[in-house]
């Protein structure tokens, strides 16, 4: 697929001004030149032209907001002054795997004041013994060359890689709706866990109350049983006492009757 056709498909019914990221990797650049890319892409921040067969960047339009440009695995041998003229905001440039042989071909990059990272892996220029020292001296604005700083410390991913399309935060400070949905889901999960914990605590409280009631019920039954036993025992004692009282009364009556008969007999003797 040629570059023009690819750009048309990538637009997806959008206007060029609405595009912030454009990936044209592996499409065909006729005559080794950039085609179909115009200065209407005023908000483009990331452009990738990996392995498209470019010989030069002389047809690159002005892209005032472009920050990252991927040009690796092409056949570019010079003409980098075009980059300095058209890409004032460029911070990351990847020229790995091109036909750059001399340090002098990099001199136009001195005018890219914002350039922080440059990659030249696989270019013949890297074969020089003093390659790194020379490039850092030529381009003092650079922080990283081939992924390492002047002290040979590897660059953090956040410095080497720049997201081409940085999504703007919404009014709530969220990058997009996805983060917000994830937070909502996490909040729901936490609420469900809290509800489950609350239900478990309620169940435990109910079980404790039931156990307390059972214990109290048993104590009440024991008290009632004790009272009944005591009452029964007292009842038996009372009955025995009543029987004894009746026997005593009968004895007294019989004793009284005996005395009466004796008096009557004595009286009869006196009469005789």
Swiss-Prot record:
GO terms for biological process: inner ear development; negative regulation of apoptotic process; negative regulation of cell differentiation; nucleosome assembly; positive regulation of cell population proliferation; positive regulation of G1/S transition of mitotic cell cycle; positive regulation of protein export from nucleus; regulation of apoptotic process. Signal peptide: none annotated. Pfam families: LRR_9. PROSITE patterns: LRR. Residues 255-265 have a biased composition (Basic and acidic residues). Predominantly expressed in brain. Expressed in the entire embryonic brain, whereas in the adult brain its expression is restricted to the subventricular zone where there are neural progenitor cells. Some glutamate residues are glycylated by TTLL8. This modification occurs exclusively on glutamate residues and results in a glycine chain on the gamma-carboxyl group. Directly cleaved by caspase-3/CASP3. A motif (Nuclear localization signal) lies at residues 260-263. Residues 123-161 form the LRRCT domain. It is found in: Nucleus. Induction: Expressed specifically during the late G1 and S phases. Keywords: Chaperone, Leucine-rich repeat, Nucleus, Phosphoprotein, Repeat. The modification Phosphothreonine is found at residue 265. One of its GO terms (molecular function) is histone binding. LRR repeats lie at residues 16-40, 43-64, 65-84, 89-110. Interacts with histones H3 and H4. Interacts with KLF5; this interaction induces promoter region-specific histone incorporation and inhibition of histone acetylation by ANP32B. Suppression of the expression of this gene by RNAi induces apoptosis. Multifunctional protein that is involved in the regulation of many processes including cell proliferation, apoptosis, cell cycle progression or transcription. Regulates the proliferation of neuronal stem cells, differentiation of leukemic cells and progression from G1 to S phase of the cell cycle. As negative regulator of caspase-3-dependent apoptosis, may act as an antagonist of ANP32A in regulating tissue homeostasis. Exhibits histone chaperone properties, able to recruit histones to certain promoters, thus regulating the transcription of specific genes. Histone binding is mediated by the concave surface of the LRR region. Belongs to the ANP32 family. This is Acidic leucine-rich nuclear phosphoprotein 32 family member B. It comes from Rattus norvegicus.
């Amino acid at each position: 697929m040629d570059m023009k056709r690819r750009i048309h498909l990538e637009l997806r019914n959008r206007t060029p001004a609405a595009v912030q990221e454009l990936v044209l990797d592996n499409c065909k650049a006729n005559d080794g030149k950039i085609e179909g890319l115009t200065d209407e892409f005023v908000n483009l921040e990331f452009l990738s032209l990996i392995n498209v067969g470019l010989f030069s960047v002389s047809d690159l339009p002005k892209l005032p907001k472009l920050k990252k440009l991927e040009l690796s695995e092409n056949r570019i041998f010079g003409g980098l002054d075009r980059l300095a003229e058209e890409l004032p905001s460029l911070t990351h440039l990847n020229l790995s795997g091109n036909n750059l042989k001399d340090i002098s071909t990099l001199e136009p990059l001195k005018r890219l004041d914002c350039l922080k990272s440059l990659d030249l892996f696989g270019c013949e220029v890297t074969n020089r013994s003093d390659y790194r020292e020379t490039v850092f001296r030529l381009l003092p604005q650079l922080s990283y060359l081939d992924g390492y700083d002047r002290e040979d410390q590897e660059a953090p991913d956040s410095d080497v890689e720049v997201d081409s399309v940085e999504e703007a935060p919404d009014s709530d400070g969220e990058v997009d709706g996805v983060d917000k949905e994830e937070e909502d889901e996490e909040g729901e999960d936490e609420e469900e866990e809290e509800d489950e914990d609350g239900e478990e605590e309620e169940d435990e409280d109910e079980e404790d109350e039931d156990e307390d009631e059972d214990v109290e019920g048993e104590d009440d039954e024991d008290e009632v049983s004790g009272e009944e036993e005591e009452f029964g025992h007292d009842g038996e004692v009372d009955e025995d006492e009543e029987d004894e009282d009746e026997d005593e009364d009968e004895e007294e009556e019989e004793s009284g009757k005996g005395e009466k008969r004796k008096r009557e007999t004595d009286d009869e003797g006196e009469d005789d």
